[in-house]
A protein has these predicted regions:
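Helix-turn-helix DNA-binding helix
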Residues: 36-37
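A short, Lys/Arg-enriched interface patch at domain edges and termini
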Residues: 71-75
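A short, conserved structural fragment
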Residues: 44-55
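Short alpha-helical "recognition helix" segments of helix-turn-helix
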Residues: 21-31
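DNA major-groove recognition helix of helix-turn-helix
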Residues: 40
Length: 175
């Protein structure tokens, strides 16, 4: 059974460029290396990852993210607290969705966060720290959070952006 932390690991792998070891990749994600090893093992069992090619199966990841993620890893908006903008409050969703500003933005709770908003649990507690150093990773996680917690309109926009992004990455892999 795929866990939220496994999707976090796969998402990082999608964005990561170049060679990696379990330990170096875990450091980049701000998680212990067994989280990466176990996550990729479960992802391989679910046909989301190929250990032989050391890459995420893009069509399977896309299908899982769009159709299953919100059921496997649902997210609810919670209490007001400081944090890092998440879901539709973070790029690329923030540019694609116009907010009325009446509702507080979704945030990942984070002591050093600069935005006060409604808490949303990230796919992994290390996400706020990891995206400070890795903005591209944060963009993918924002799309996934929008699929997990957004209303139908937000989910449609996130789906379109995710499909476009994954298609772009698939084209780059073929080169």
């Amino acid at each position: 059974m795929v866990k939220k932390s496994d999707i976090y690991v796969l998402s990082g792998l999608l964005v990561h460029e170049g060679d990696w070891s379990y330990r170096s990749f875990a450091d980049r994600l701000h998680v212990p290396h067994p989280v990466v090893q176990r996550g990729l093992s479960r992802a391989q069992d679910a046909d989301l990852y190929s250990a032989e090619q050391r890459e995420v199966h893009l069509p399977h990841f896309e299908e899982f993210a769009i159709h299953a993620l919100r059921f496997v890893a649902p997210a609810q908006l919670g209490a007001l607290m400081p944090g890092v903008p998440a879901a539709w409050a973070a790029e690329p969703m923030a540019s694609a969705i116009r907010s009325s500003g009446a509702e507080p933005p979704p945030v990942w709770p984070y002591a050093r966060g600069q935005v006060r908003g409604q808490a949303i649990e990230p796919l992994h507690p290390a996400a706020p720290e990891a995206v400070e150093e890795w903005p591209e990773f944060g963009e993918l996680l924002a799309l996934l959070d929008s699929l997990r917690a957004g209303d139908p309109r937000v989910r449609r926009v996130a789906e379109d952006l995710l499909v476009s992004l994954l298609s772009e990455w698939a084209g780059e892999r073929k080169r």
